[in-house]
């Protein structure tokens, strides 16, 4: 009996202590060691910032590092519009960067599906055989540029209309983070995890946007895809680099 009472008392003490620890743990937000929101968030005060964060950048939104020397975010409505534009373009840039590199990588491994260089692939529609998706005529086969453009406009219009209107009628979903059927893995179920994923998304999206800009410049300057440009640079860094190509565009005496 004494053993049972002692065990019960010990169990009660343990449960109380565990409950306090659990409550304290639940109260503390999850963190990766760096704050991304609020006044104590990580900041990047770039040129002409006078080492001060504008009052209108409060750290409420993901990707806010406190730098806005041009005052682009001063007006709330303009800021809201720019946030939407940046995020949508960042997502397209991530898909685009992946799409620019994947065909070249597959072609290097021996996969044959027509033109692998991203800025040359579309021109295959003007060839005699037309454009075959992945080089397979049984998949998507395109020969008419007008019909292809019309289909793209219609499909993109439907998708954008769906997004802007918040998804299916009556659901009222967030046009930027709709969730539900757009999040089948439940990545946004936990609010703290979701908040951190928003930051990761916009950071990687900004990097992808710069990557796409670089791919465009490479296409104009070298006439090659990003993977081939990387291979050329690694093979001979002193000859194949940005500085060497830049000299070709400088006026000569």
Swiss-Prot record:
One GO molecular function term of this record is: metal ion binding
Please tell me one Gene Ontology term that the record gives under cellular component.
photosystem I
Locate the residues binding chlorophyll a 6: 233, 242
Family statement drawn from the similarity comment of this UniProt entry: Belongs to the light-harvesting chlorophyll a/b-binding (LHC) protein family.
- Residues that, per the record, bind chlorophyll b 2: 91, 140
Which sites bind chlorophyll b 1? 44
The Gene Ontology biological process annotation of the record reads: photosynthesis, light harvesting
What organism is recorded for this protein? Chlamydomonas reinhardtii
Where in or outside the cell is it found?
Answer: Plastid, Chloroplast thylakoid membrane
Q: Give a short account of what the protein does.
A: The light-harvesting complex (LHC) functions as a light receptor, it captures and delivers excitation energy to photosystems with which it is closely associated.
Where is chlorophyll b 3 bound in this sequence?
A: 160
Binding annotation for chlorophyll a 5: 200, 218
Look up and give the membrane topology term: Multi-pass membrane protein
- Entries under SUPFAM superfamilies matching the protein: Chlorophyll a-b binding protein (SSF103511)
Q: What name does UniProt use for this protein? A: Chlorophyll a-b binding protein of LHCII type I, chloroplastic
Query: Binding positions for chlorophyll a 1?
Result: 67, 73, 86, 206
Q: Which residues bind chlorophyll a 4?
A: 204
Task: Kindly give the Gene3D superfamilies that the UniProt entry links to this protein.
Answer: Chlorophyll a/b binding protein domain
Question: Which InterPro entries does the protein's record reference?
Answer: Chloro_AB-bd_pln, Chloroa_b-bind
Pfam families, per the entry = Chloroa_b-bind (PF00504)
Annotated cofactor note: Binds at least 14 chlorophylls (8 Chl-a and 6 Chl-b) and carotenoids such as lutein and neoxanthin.
Question: What's in the keyword line of the UniProt record?
Answer: Chlorophyll, Chloroplast, Chromophore, Magnesium, Membrane, Metal-binding, Phosphoprotein, Photosynthesis, Photosystem I, Photosystem II, Plastid, Thylakoid, Transit peptide, Transmembrane, Transmembrane helix
């Amino acid at each position: 009996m004494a053993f049972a009472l002692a065990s019960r008392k010990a169990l009660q003490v343990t449960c109380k202590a565990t409950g306090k620890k659990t409550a304290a743990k639940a109260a503390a937000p999850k963190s990766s060691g760096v704050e991304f929101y609020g006044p104590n968030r990580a900041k990047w005060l770039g040129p002409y910032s006078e080492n001060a964060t504008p009052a209108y950048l409060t750290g409420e939104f993901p990707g806010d590092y406190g730098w806005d020397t041009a005052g682009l975010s001063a007006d709330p409505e303009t800021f809201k519009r720019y946030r939407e534009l940046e995020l949508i373009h960042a997502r397209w840039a991530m898909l685009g960067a992946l799409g620019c590199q994947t065909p070249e990588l597959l072609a290097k491994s021996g996969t044959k599906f027509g033109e692998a260089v991203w800025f040359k692939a579309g021109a295959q529609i003007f060839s005699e055989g037309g454009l075959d998706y992945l080089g397979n005529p049984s998949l998507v086969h395109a020969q008419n540029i007008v019909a292809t453009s019309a289909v793209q406009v219609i499909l993109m219009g439907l998708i954008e209309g769906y997004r802007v209107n918040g998804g299916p009628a009556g659901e009222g979903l967030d046009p930027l983070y709709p969730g539900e059927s757009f999040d089948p893995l439940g990545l946004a179920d936990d609010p703290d995890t979701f908040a951190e994923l928003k930051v990761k998304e916009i950071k990687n999206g900004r990097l992808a946007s710069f990557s796409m800009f670089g791919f465009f410049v490479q296409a104009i300057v070298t006439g090659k895809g990003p993977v081939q440009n990387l291979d050329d640079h690694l093979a001979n860094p002193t000859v194949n680099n940005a500085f060497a190509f830049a000299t070709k565009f400088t006026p000569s005496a």
